[in-house]
From Swiss-Prot:
Note: Present with 996 molecules/cell in log phase SD medium.
Matches recorded under Pfam families: CBM_21 (PF03370)
Keywords: Phosphoprotein
Organism: Saccharomyces cerevisiae (strain ATCC 204508 / S288c) (Baker's yeast)
GO cellular component, one term: cytoplasm
GO molecular function: glycogen binding; protein phosphatase 1 binding; protein phosphatase regulator activity
Gene3D superfamilies per UniProt: Carbohydrate binding type-21 domain
Protein's name in the database: GSY2-interacting protein PIG2
Matching PANTHER family: GLYCOGEN-BINDING SUBUNIT 76A, PROTEIN PHOSPHATASE 1 REGULATORY SUBUNIT
Known role: Interacts with glycogen synthase 2 (GSY2); possibly also interacts with phosphatase 1 (GLC7).
Length: 538
C-alpha cells in the first residue's frame, strides 16, 4: 500500500497545510501522489522543493477569445468593469438602480451577469474590497512625519471647496425628480468634476518673432483692436463726392478721374505737404507751357515780365533742390552729414506754422527727399541705386490724406530674379520695441520707366499711424526697412534687404490733431491727386 508523506517546509521543517482546492490540484498536479516504478514497486517520494512564486494566485486564461466583439463593445465593457463604487461600505455594481435609471436596469441586467463571468475569467481579484481613504468616509490616512519631525505634505490635491458639491450628473444618475439628494450615501468620487480642457477653435494665432515679447504682442493687439493676418486691399475713402465708401487706388489712377477732378485738386492755398515741396510747382509748370504755346500773348500781356521772372525763380529752386538731394545721396562722412542736416533745417523753416506746429506731411530724417512731384530727385535716386547694383530699393513714399484717416503709400523697385517674390516692409513706431509687417503687392513692371532693366514695381501701404508714447501728439516717428525674398536659379533661397545702408529709413509723420471733416484752408483732394504714382521721366 502506497504511503504519502506531508511535504515539509523548506525553511521551518514543519508540515504545510495545503488547501484542498480542485483548481490547484488540476493546474499544478497532486504533489502528494506516489510515483510507481516500472517494476510495479512503489517508491517513496522525497519532499519536493517548493518555490514561493507557486503560491501566487495566477489568473486562468480565457476559455474562448471574444474575437467577434467590436472595439466599442470592449470599451464599454472595460468602462463598466472600472465602475466599482461603494455606498456605506458595500460594493455596488455600475448598473445599480441608484446609478442608472430604472428604465434601463432590466435591459442591462443580463449583460451584468455575463460581464461578471468574464471578470472572473480575467481577474478574480477585481472584486477585492478596496476603498479610497478620505476624510469624508471617516477613514483619514495617518500622518507621516520625517526624521526631523516635519510633517510630510501630501502631493495629492483635494477637491476644492469652492466647487459646487451637487453637479448635474448626480441628479441624472439618481433617477429622482427631486433636486434634493442625500449626499451621505453618495460616494465622494461622484462629486469630483472632470478636469478636461476645452480649446476654442476660432481663437486667432499670433506668430512671435525672435525678439518679440508677450507684452509687446499685447500692446499690438490693443492698438490694432483685432488680429488680422490677411492682406488689406489698397483703398481710400472717397473724398471726391463727400461719401464714405472705399474707392480702390486703381480707380483713382485712371486718367478719367484725374481729368474730371483736376481743377478741384489744384485748389490749395497752403500747399506744403511732402518733404517741404511746394504745391505751386505744378501751377507754375502749367503757366510755363502756356508761355511756350503762345508767345504773342506774352508780348501783349502787361504782366508778362512778372510771369517770366516767376518761371526763372522756380527753375532756380528746382536746380537747388536737385543739388540738395544729390548731396544727401552722396554722404560719406559725419561732417558732411551734420552740415547737410543743418542746411536742411534752415531750408525747411517754411515747414512751420507759427513757432511750434508743422503742417501735415512726411519729414525725412536720414535719407534724401523721395517725392513723386520732384521727378528729378526720383530719377536721380533710381540711377544711383541701379549703379550700386541693389536688387531692392525704395523708390518713393508719400502720405495720402482723407477725411477720416491717413495712409502712407510707397513704391519699391525689385530685380526680377525669379517669378516667385515676396516683399515685406517691416516698420515700427516705438524704436523697435514692437514692429509690424506690411506685405507689398505687385503694381507693374518698370519697362515704362527703365526699358530693359528687368525690374518690377511693388507698392505698400501703412495705415496704422499712431504714437504709442504719446497718444495726444500729432507727430509719430516711423522707422522701416524692406525685405526681399525670392529663389535663385538653383532653387536656393535668396534674401535681400534695403535698410538705408544699415541705418533704416526714419520719417517724422505729422498728422492733424483732430480730423472731423474737410477744412477751408487745406483741401485733402489736392494731396490725393499729387500723391499718385507717376512716371518721373515724362
Amino acid at each position: 500500500m502506497a504511503t504519502t508523506t506531508q511535504p515539509q517546509n523548506i525553511l521551518m521543517d514543519e508540515p504545510l497545510n495545503l488547501p484542498n482546492n480542485s483548481a490547484h490540484n488540476n493546474n499544478y498536479g497532486n504533489i502528494n501522489a506516489n510515483i510507481r516504478t516500472f517494476a510495479g514497486m512503489s517508491m517513496h517520494m522525497h519532499p519536493a522543493r517548493l518555490n514561493s512564486l507557486e503560491f501566487l494566485h495566477k489568473p486562468r486564461r480565457l476559455s474562448n477569445v471574444k474575437l467577434h466583439r467590436l472595439p466599442q463593445d470592449e470599451l464599454q465593457r472595460n468602462t463598466d468593469m472600472n465602475k466599482g463604487m461603494y455606498f456605506n461600505g458595500k460594493q455596488v455594481h455600475a448598473h445599480h438602480p441608484f446609478i442608472n435609471s430604472g428604465a434601463n436596469f432590466n435591459a442591462h441586467h443580463q449583460d451584468v451577469s455575463k460581464l461578471g463571468e468574464e471578470e472572473d475569467e480575467i481577474s478574480p481579484l477585481s472584486h477585492d474590497n478596496f476603498q479610497y481613504e478620505s476624510e469624508e468616509n471617516g477613514n483619514p490616512s495617518p500622518p507621516i512625519y520625517k526624521k526631523s519631525g516635519e510633517l510630510v505634505k501630501s502631493s495629492l490635491k483635494r477637491r476644492s471647496k469652492s466647487l459646487p458639491i451637487t453637479p448635474k450628473s448626480i441628479f441624472n444618475k439618481t433617477g429622482s425628480k427631486s433636486k434634493h439628494v442625500n449626499l451621505d450615501h453618495v460616494d465622494t468620487r461622484l462629486l469630483q468634476r472632470s478636469k478636461s480642457v476645452h480649446f476654442d477653435r476660432v481663437l486667432p494665432i499670433k506668430l512671435f518673432n525672435e525678439n518679440e515679447k508677450p507684452i509687446d504682442v499685447g500692446k499690438q493687439m490693443v492698438q490694432q483692436d483685432v488680429l488680422n493676418f490677411k492682406h488689406k486691399p489698397l483703398t481710400r475713402l472717397s473724398a471726391l463726392n463727400g461719401g464714405s465708401d472705399s474707392v480702390p487706388i486703381e480707380d483713382l489712377l485712371s486718367e478719367n478721374n484725374q481729368n474730371e477732378y483736376g481743377d478741384t485738386w489744384l485748389q490749395n492755398p497752403k500747399g506744403v505737404f511732402l518733404f517741404g515741396t511746394n504745391s505751386n510747382n505744378r501751377r507754375n509748370k502749367k503757366k510755363k507751357f502756356k508761355l511756350s504755346d503762345d508767345d504773342s500773348d506774352i508780348e501783349n500781356d502787361n504782366d508778362s515780365d512778372d510771369a517770366i521772372n516767376r518761371l526763372v525763380r522756380q527753375q532756380d529752386k528746382d536746380q537747388a533742390h536737385l543739388a540738395h538731394g544729390l548731396k544727401n545721396l552722396l554722404i560719406n562722412d559725419d561732417d558732411d552729414y551734420l552740415e547737410t542736416r543743418t542746411n536742411s533745417a534752415k531750408s525747411g523753416a517754411n515747414l512751420f506754422i507759427g513757432n511750434s506746429k508743422r503742417i501735415v506731411g512726411l519729414y525725412n530724417k536720414n535719407f534724401p527727399i523721395l517725392s513723386d512731384r520732384n521727378r528729378k530727385s526720383l530719377k536721380l535716386n533710381i540711377f544711383l541705386n541701379l549703379s550700386r547694383g541693389r536688387p531692392v530699393f525704395l523708390q518713393e513714399i508719400t502720405l495720402l490724406t482723407g477725411f477720416h484717416n491717413m495712409v502712407i503709400i510707397g513704391k519699391v523697385f525689385v530685380k526680377n530674379i525669379y517669378f516667385d517674390k515676396k516683399i515685406i516692409v517691416r516698420y515700427t513706431w516705438d524704436a523697435w520695441r514692437t514692429f509690424h509687417e506690411s506685405e507689398c503687392v505687385y503694381f507693374s513692371n518698370a519697362n515704362g520707366i527703365l526699358p530693359g532693366s528687368n525690374m518690377d514695381i511693388f507698392k505698400f501701404s501703412i495705415d496704422d499711424i499712431h504714437n504709442p508714447n504719446d497718444k495726444d501728439s500729432n507727430i509719430s516717428q516711423l522707422e522701416f526697412c524692406i525685405q526681399y525674398l525670392t529663389w535663385g536659379v538653383d532653387r536656393s533661397r535668396k534674401e535681400y534687404w534695403d535698410n538705408n545702408d544699415s541705418a533704416n529709413y526714419k520719417i517724422d509723420v505729422v498728422t492733424n490733431e483732430t480730423r472731423t471733416g474737410p477744412t477751408t484752408d487745406v483741401n485733402d483732394n489736392y494731396e490725393m491727386k499729387h500723391s499718385l504714382f507717376r512716371n518721373p521721366f515724362h
